[in-house]
């Protein structure tokens, strides 16, 4: 199940994200928060010590029954900019970032694993007919 908190004026169709959430975590709640550049920069600085805006952040919650799996926070203006730059829809860019974030909630870590997150992202991108993700675009 997907809970959405859109704190931006950007409008998007979230049906695809609901389908992705149901595939990745069919019995769990995932919170999606769409925020501004300034807000994600503040979150990144406060919680990670990184004083810059980024595209997506993931925050897993403790394994407490009846609580969400975690939160995926997406920089909506940056997603819109990247979608235009890369020639695909805002919905597709948000879906790519959402997949990336949810995989982190599920324990994947592309900075430490041996390609497992990249492989899982690729499988999901093909299954949902999405363009290349950031992790695939930066692949060697």
Swiss-Prot record:
Compartments (UniProt record): Cytoplasm
One Pfam family recorded for the sequence: YbeY
Gene Ontology CC, one term: cytoplasm
InterPro entries, alphabetized: MetalPrtase_cat_dom_sf_prd, YbeY, YbeY_CS
Database matches in Gene3D superfamilies: Metalloproteases ('zincins'), catalytic domain (3.40.390.30)
Entry's Gene Ontology molecular function annotations: metalloendopeptidase activity; RNA endonuclease activity; zinc ion binding
Protein name per the record: Endoribonuclease YbeY
């Amino acid at each position: 199940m997907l809970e959405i908190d859109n704190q931006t004026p950007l409008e998007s169709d979230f049906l695809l994200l609901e389908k992705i959430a149901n595939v990745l975590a069919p019995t769990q709640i995932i919170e999606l928060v769409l925020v501004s550049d300034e807000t994600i920069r503040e979150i990144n600085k406060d919680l990670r010590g990184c004083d810059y805006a980024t595209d997506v952040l993931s925050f897993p919650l403790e394994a407490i029954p009846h609580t969400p799996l975690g939160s995926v926070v997406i920089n909506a203006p940056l997603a819109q900019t990247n979608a235009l730059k890369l020639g695909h829809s805002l919905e597709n860019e948000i879906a790519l970032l959402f997949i990336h974030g949810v995989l982190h909630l599920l324990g994947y870590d592309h900075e430490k694993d041996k390609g497992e997150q990249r492989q899982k992202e690729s499988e999901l991108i093909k299954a949902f007919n999405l363009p290349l993700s950031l992790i695939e675009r930066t692949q060697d």
